[in-house]
Amino acid sequence: MRRDDAAPVGWAVSTQPVPYPAAVAAMEARAAAIADGTAGELIWLLEHPPLYTAGVSAKAGDLIQPDRFPVFESGRGGQFTYHGPGQRVAYVMLDLTQRGRDVRAFVAALEAWIIDALAAFNVTGELREGRVGVWVERKGAGWSREDKIAAIGVKLRRWVSFHGISLNVEPDLSHFSGIVPCGQTEHGVTSLVDLGLPVTLDDADAALRASFSKVFGPVEDAEAPV
């Protein structure tokens, strides 16, 4: 999923939590500028304050505790998800007219990016038919289960993507109990720290950056939109 011209993608990191409405406004403005040819592609890494977002397929019954955190309609694909401190959100603003107008290939590239980044910590990320995102199989004495470690939800406008992925590094996993995450009632959520790994957001950022370059091409430091 690389550009033919190998132009680098901007890589920006916000060091303070960004309110969701401000992030969406900045994303939409940047995506429009990319489509107009007045701005370059951008990957924007950030955290949000605790909140829930509803994708276009969200079901009202999956919002179990509507008063727990603010709830936002997102317009992205998918259902309900949680964002909050300790979770690395990466908003992906890429021009698919330069990379191939193939939505399936784009989502597969996002999955490959996450899986390769997890491998840096010796975590095997897996895909499951009919379940969006990246999963980790966990086994113990006489038991096994599959927990979600990363979510994917994107939107395209004029063939420019926005929204993106979220990777659970060290969020408060109890915050997911206010929703049915991504409509999955039979499976849980996990994080790198929950798996027993002493991983920081900086560690995750380094792995995500290295893996992105493998899948999508080179990056260069950029200023965060907010």
Curated annotation (Swiss-Prot):
Residues 37-220 form the BPL/LPL catalytic domain. InterPro entries: aa-tRNA-synth_II/BPL/LPL, BPL_LPL_catalytic, Octanoyltransferase, Octanoyltransferase_CS. Coiled coil: none annotated. SUPFAM superfamilies: Class II aaRS and biotin synthetases. The record marks 148 as: Lowers pKa of active site Cys. The active site is at 182 (acyl-thioester intermediate). PROSITE patterns: BPL_LPL_CATALYTIC, LIPB. It is an enzyme of class 2 (transferase). GO terms for cellular component: cytoplasm. Substrate binds at residues 76-83, 151-153, 164-166. Transmembrane segments: none annotated. It catalyses: octanoyl-[ACP] + L-lysyl-[protein] = N(6)-octanoyl-L-lysyl-[protein] + holo-[ACP] + H(+). It holds the Pfam family LplA-B_cat. Signal peptide: none annotated. GO terms for biological process: protein modification process. Catalyzes the transfer of endogenously produced octanoic acid from octanoyl-acyl-carrier-protein onto the lipoyl domains of lipoate-dependent enzymes. Lipoyl-ACP can also act as a substrate although octanoyl-ACP is likely to be the physiological substrate. Belongs to the LipB family. In the reaction, the free carboxyl group of octanoic acid is attached via an amide linkage to the epsilon-amino group of a specific lysine residue of lipoyl domains of lipoate-dependent enzymes. This is Octanoyltransferase. It comes from Caulobacter vibrioides (strain ATCC 19089 / CIP 103742 / CB 15).
